[in-house]
């Protein structure tokens, strides 16, 4: 299940550089993090849902690659983002 429009709009307001910024690395990572956190509740209830687990792993890998890119290019923004999101890095 995807995120609601209100949640997405709040993430865009919190992490976007501008009003219509949907493609910056910070916004993409924040959206993926919210979706990953949302799916964790699903997996507590549906332990054997392996098809959705594959999608979750794809999201985690995508987020990992985006974070590696951000760390390589703009380390200050990377540090700020992981602090805001509470990621263990």
Curated annotation (Swiss-Prot):
An example of a Gene Ontology cellular component annotation for this protein is: cytosolic small ribosomal subunit
Q: Name one GO biological process term.
A: translation
Pfam families, sorted: Ribosomal_S15
The Swiss-Prot or TrEMBL record annotates one GO molecular function as: rRNA binding
The record's listing under SUPFAM superfamilies reads: S15/NS1 RNA-binding domain (SSF47060)
**Source organism, top-level taxon:** Bacteria
Keyword annotations from UniProtKB, A to Z = Ribonucleoprotein, Ribosomal protein, RNA-binding, rRNA-binding
PANTHER family reported for this sequence: RIBOSOMAL PROTEIN S15, BACTERIAL AND ORGANELLAR (PTHR23321), SMALL RIBOSOMAL SUBUNIT PROTEIN US15M (PTHR23321:SF26)
Its family? Belongs to the universal ribosomal protein uS15 family.
The protein's role, per its UniProt record: One of the primary rRNA binding proteins, it binds directly to 16S rRNA where it helps nucleate assembly of the platform of the 30S subunit by binding and bridging several RNA helices of the 16S rRNA. Forms an intersubunit bridge (bridge B4) with the 23S rRNA of the 50S subunit in the ribosome.
Assembly and partners are described as: Part of the 30S ribosomal subunit. Forms a bridge to the 50S subunit in the 70S ribosome, contacting the 23S rRNA.
- The protein here is known as Small ribosomal subunit protein uS15
Natural source organism = Shewanella loihica (strain ATCC BAA-1088 / PV-4)
Q: What is the lineage of its organism?
A: Bacteria, Pseudomonadati, Pseudomonadota, Gammaproteobacteria, Alteromonadales
Gene behind this chain?
rpsO
